């Protein structure tokens, strides 16, 4: 059975269009999630409690888009260590709930806070689609 070239061309075009729309959808999802993260962590008006409460979303974003986040090797190792330590702390239960306080308390005023700042900076610096803060050079 011969399939006309025209039908094969149409099928190929359809496949390419579907693949492009899936990629565009993933880019939109990345941009939306990145915007939410930046609204929280790149905004001085957001309080520390809100930032700490959103650390799981920050970690999830990092795990979902590792290739899009460009951290120097040393920062990446530190970030991976932080993620492992944070995840471990959340799995330890006290009376059926994750432990409160501990090393995560006041996380944003510590070395981990600096690491999160580097992570956010990498989202802004290395992604040309990220709007720069007013007055930035």
Curated annotation (Swiss-Prot):
GO terms for cellular component: extracellular space. It comes from the Eukaryota. One of its GO terms (biological process) is innate immune response. InterPro entries: Turandot (IPR010825). The keyword Signal applies. It is found in: Secreted. The keyword Secreted applies. Keywords: Immunity, Innate immunity, Secreted, Signal. Residues 1-24 form the signal peptide. Its main location: secreted. Transmembrane segments: none annotated. A humoral factor that may play a role in stress tolerance. Belongs to the Turandot family. This is Protein Turandot X.
């Amino acid at each position: 059975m011969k399939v006309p070239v025209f039908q094969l061309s149409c099928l190929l075009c359809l496949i390419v269009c579907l693949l492009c729309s899936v990629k565009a959808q993933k880019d939109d999802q990345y941009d939306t999630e990145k915007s939410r993260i930046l609204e929280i962590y790149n905004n001085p008006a957001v309080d520390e409690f809100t930032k700490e409460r959103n650390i799981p979303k920050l970690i999830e974003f990092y795990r979902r888009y590792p290739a899009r986040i460009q951290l120097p090797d040393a920062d990446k190792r530190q970030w991976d260590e932080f993620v492992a330590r944070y995840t471990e702390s959340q799995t330890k239960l006290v009376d059926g709930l994750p432990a409160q306080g501990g090393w995560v308390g006041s996380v944003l005023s510590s070395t981990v806070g600096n690491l999160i700042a580097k992570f956010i900076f990498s989202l802004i610096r290395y992604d040309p689609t990220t709007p720069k803060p007013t007055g930035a050079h």
